[in-house]
Amino acid sequence: MTPLIETNWELFDGKENVDFKQMNGWISEDKSLINRLENKYGTINLEVLNEEETEYSDKELGFERVKGNLRKVFLKAQKDIVYAESFFSSKVYKKFPKFKRLAKEPLGKYLFNNPLISKKETYVAKYSLGNNKYLGRKCIYDLDGERFFVVEVFLFHE
């Protein structure tokens, strides 16, 4: 079972999020989540739920039925810690072919080591999983003029 989005995405402006203010440090994190999560939870494993070529529509990117690679994963320690999705259009992975098929490799390995990739915007939304409520972020990145997103739902309340 994966988290379900409950609210629309709202642009995160760096101010305290009233409902989840304790999560603002995670929302504004600009480095690899895995490194920070390992400091908190120990060894982090990546479980790929699905990775496939598909058509995808996205309001924040202005995409309507764009073909690309959609990957869904859990970052896990003793339990699921973060649920993540990433979408790379075919235009993105033509510029960086590894994004066509990441398999079990952590995205941050490439995201934070490529000078052509820059973060443009961060959005927040509320999610639910079972009876629990969580906060998610959606980061919009640019790779040499082409945009893609990474969604991370934090399955904890720090």
Placement of each model-derived feature along the sequence:
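Conserved, well-structured functional cores that handle cations and Mg-NTP chemistry
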Residues: 134
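N-terminal domain-onset segments
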Residues: 1-129, 143-158
